[in-house]
Design a protein with these regions (language model features):
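Sec-dependent N-terminal signal peptides of Gram-positive bacterial secreted proteins and lipoproteins
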Residues: 2-28
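Generic recognition of cysteine residues
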Residues: 16, 20-22, 45, 74, ...
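C-terminal soluble interaction/assembly domains
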Residues: 398-404, 411-448
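Preferential activation on post-signal-peptide N-terminal prodomains/segments
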Residues: 22-306, 442-447
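Residue-level detector of beta-strand structural context in well-folded domains
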Residues: 185, 315, 406, 423-425
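Helix N-cap and loop-to-helix transition residues
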Residues: 94, 233, 346-347, 428
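Short, solvent-exposed coil/turn segments at beta-strand boundaries
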Residues: 192, 200-203, 317-325, 401-403, ...
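Segments that shape or occlude catalytic/ligand-binding pockets
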Residues: 238-416
């Protein structure tokens, strides 16, 4: 099944992290509270009994000579009547699963090729044309000297004589235990490539159109990125993404966010405006939360018992006017069972107290004399989200638990430039303990 009106692919994959000028807090400097469980059992209540304000405004909740902490936050809680813990099991990407997903982009697997060390004749000819054009340019327009270009051209003409006409078809065997990026295959449509690769011990899969994804709201320094015309409505994009996700080998995934973005090919030969439709693992209206790559997730301890055994289950679907042009699937899992009893949550007033205390712990290192010359930092909490967060099951690497959590999104502002570094702190909604939704090494302990 094809989920594109006119498939658009690109040459290569470029991963770009757009960082603010203000640097995030060094992990080695963070002080962590010693009390993992913050409240007594008799103070807890179910989600239906929990009283939660819509906003939290508190100026100067903590002030010192080196930092000021405040809150001006909206509080986002889905309309749910119950909340239960979930046990999920790993669902790594093996070859048969990858093929099923790949077939949503191509007519059949014969269109997918292995990446060869040797370029094809067509690829070499395209490179020759590009370098000859550069050679014909004026000297000030060239990136290299004529001698350097001619050396490259001579090598390309030599390789052209023995270059294969086509690439080998198929996909490479995927080593699900690989800790880094692992190439699987590529397909060519409209003379552009899309690369299929895996990451994170077989728990994530990217079918990525080439280029850099820039989200609306990106601060260029002299202006904010605004994306107006994508060519389809948000509802049309949602319908296309829903049909695509319904064909994936997944369970209990629901749309949790929509973002406008643009895909920029590195040489700026094309810009594709698109919607990024975000799906999270969901049960009875409560979902995992995607905070995006722009946020710094601060650690709890070096070997946190609340650290994630694999990434949160999140699917990003890239939809342009041509349909689905790519997807990223992190932390694939399947629901094993749902707890029969409802979660007992600490009151939100105690969540606020826990946030105040942990923020103070987190930035107390700035009082040290060695930071005397650093400008004061303003820390402002601007959003709090309620959702599931992944945590480990002690002694079982194939299982994980999804528990309710508060995602506290905030910014660090440095006076010297006024720019804010985004960060997020995650608190267990049942205990108030810090959580760490990042993938960690096997030697870190996990929660029971």
């Amino acid at each position: 099944m094809l989920f594109h009106k006119r498939a658009i692919t690109a040459y290569g994959i470029f991963i770009c992290a757009l960082l603010c000028a203000c640097q995030p807090t060094p992990e080695s400097s963070i002080v962590v509270g010693s009390e993992p469980n913050y409240t007594s059992a008799d103070a807890k209540c179910t989600i239906g009994e929990l009283i939660i304000p819509e906003i939290w405004i508190e100026k100067d909740m903590e002030t010192s000579k080196k930092y000021r902490i405040s809150a001006d936050a909206c509080i986002e809680v889905p309309h749910i009547t119950e909340c239960r813990n979930i046990i999920v099991k790993r669902a790594p990407f093996y070859s048969t699963k990858i093929e099923k997903i790949a077939k949503l982009f191509v007519e059949d697997m014969s269109q997918i090729y292995m990446r060869d060390i040797n370029l094809t004749k067509q690829e070499i000819l395209e490179m020759i044309i590009a370098y000859e054009r550069q050679l014909a340019q004026k000297s000030e327009e060239r990136d290299m000297s004529p001698a350097e270009i001619n050396t490259i051209l001579n090598d390309l003409y030599t390789r052209l004589e023995t270059a294969p006409e086509t690439k080998q078809q198929g996909i490479l065997n995927f080593n699900s235990k690989s800790e880094g990026d692992e190439y699987i295959g590529e397909f060519l449509l409209n003379n552009r490539k899309t690369i299929i690769f895996g990451i994170m011990n077989g728990m994530s899969l990217y079918i990525a159109p080439g280029g850099v994804t820039q989200y609306e709201g990106l601060d260029w320094g002299d202006g904010i990125l605004k994306i107006d015309d994508i060519g389809i409505s948000e509802q049309e994009a949602a319908d296309i993404a829903e049909l695509f996700v319904s064909s994936l080998p997944c369970d209990n995934m629901a749309l949790i966010d929509t973002k406008k973005a643009q895909l920029v090919e590195p040489s700026n030969e094309y810009i594709i405006p698109l919607y990024v439709m975000v799906y999270g693992k969901t049960n009875n209206g409560l979902s995992t939360v995607d905070v995006g790559t722009g946020y710094t997730v601060y650690p709890t301890t070096a070997a946190s018992e609340y650290a994630a055994p694999w990434p949160q289950d999140i699917i990003l679907v890239y939809v342009s006017r041509d349909g689905v042009i790519g997807c990223e699937w992190n932390g694939a899992s399947e629901i094993d069972y749902v707890d029969k009893s409802e979660c007992e949550l600490i009151p939100f007033s105690q969540v606020q107290t826990r946030i105040r205390e942990q923020m103070k712990y987190r930035y107390s290192y700035l009082e040290d004399e060695k930071y005397a010359r650093i400008d004061p930092i303003d820390i402002c909490i601007d959003k709090i989200k309620f959702g599931y967060c992944i945590t480990g099951v002690k002694g079982n690497a194939e299982r994980a638990r999804l528990v309710p959590a508060w995602y506290v999104l905030y910014r660090e502002f440095a006076e010297e430039n006024g720019e804010g570094t985004e960060a997020v702190m995650v608190l267990n909604a049942e205990t108030g303990a810090l959580m760490d939704p990042r993938i960690v090494s096997d030697d870190n302990s996990t929660a029971e």
